[in-house]
Amino acid sequence: MRGRMRTTTVLGLALGLSAAAPFGCGAGSAVDAPADAATAEAAPPKIPPAPPNGTEDASVASGPERLSATGLYADFASRTLTAGVVRFTPAHPLWADGAQKERFILLPPGAKIDTSDMNAWVFPVGTKLWKTFRVDGKLVETRFMWKRAAPPGSDSWWKAAYLWEADGSDAIVKPDGVPSALGTTHDVPSQTDCVYCHENVRDAAIGFSAFELSSPRAGLTDAGADDAGTPPEGTGLLLSLAAQGNFTTPPSADFVVPGTGNVRDVLAYFHGNCGFCHKKDGKLEQQSALRLRLLTTDTTPEVTGAYTTPIHLKMRHVMAPDISEGVVPGQPEKSQLYMRMISDTVRMPPKGTKVVDPYGSGIVRDWILALPP
């Protein structure tokens, strides 16, 4: 997809990493109801056991107050990563108003990710994930998720955002969020905002999954780049991690987004930006019939939810003046799926973004225009 590639050395190995990796959820006001709405240059490092993190105790009721206590960096001042922390970039990242992102994961000692259901991974207790945001190059926030032991029926993940000090000396947890953080247009989410999106997947993590870790060029020839002619995002860690024993049920091949050209781009975009809510068994299942998440068993565009559910789907709410269907082939201006992406009042997604994604809205518009009546 979109995004320049740069080479970054991580734990002694060169990985192709995206220089700009959008991933977030949108800020339109909720009126009626929002419910309807680079391949690696060298083998990535194996995720070894995480070292003990001193002050961190899985029995504490709350998480660390400072980012420096979360275990991301062995030396915070120099930003030296803790041994075992691995960078990754999703192949199909979520739009976040053009913010630049870095993502990291750390697995606990000797643990494996349960991949018996390849569409719904379960992470071991002790897993940690971080995502750092820069806006116009300015370090603004880092989000942290930490899976801890919890009673049955309760959320085992600590989820919080940390606002960076202006001098970059540390970042402080902000449970209630921070609007227009550090003088930017970027809003740091509250813990409630974190739950809004992350409760909708089986085990909280959205961007670390089968499709997101597959090589973004899986199934493409060298001549089969996306419509923009630029390399896709992603570090393509899936098969390397599988070979190194990080999964209970290792896949034997990358998972290929069906289709070619614009069709492939749109399906990938829906998966990364819409599918974690609009899917079977999601929190919107009873409110909306949209199914925009890819399944690892999808082999052709025609069997995907993006083709079988939104076309001529009667939506729960009519969008003014008379837009009532999910997708009307050939007519993006009559299609809620497109119009809500560009709306100022009923924007999809409803959290985490204030700016229309020109790439995403453009390819969705082109896709609808090309659909046969």
Model-derived segments and their meaning:
Residues 23, 125, 329:
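Short glycine-rich loop/turn motifs that provide flexible caps or phosphate-binding loops at active sites
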Residues 9-15, 360:
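Sec-dependent signal peptide hydrophobic core
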Residues 1, 15-17, 22-57, 222, ...:
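Ser/Thr-rich, Pro/Gly/Ala-heavy low-complexity intrinsically disordered linkers and tails
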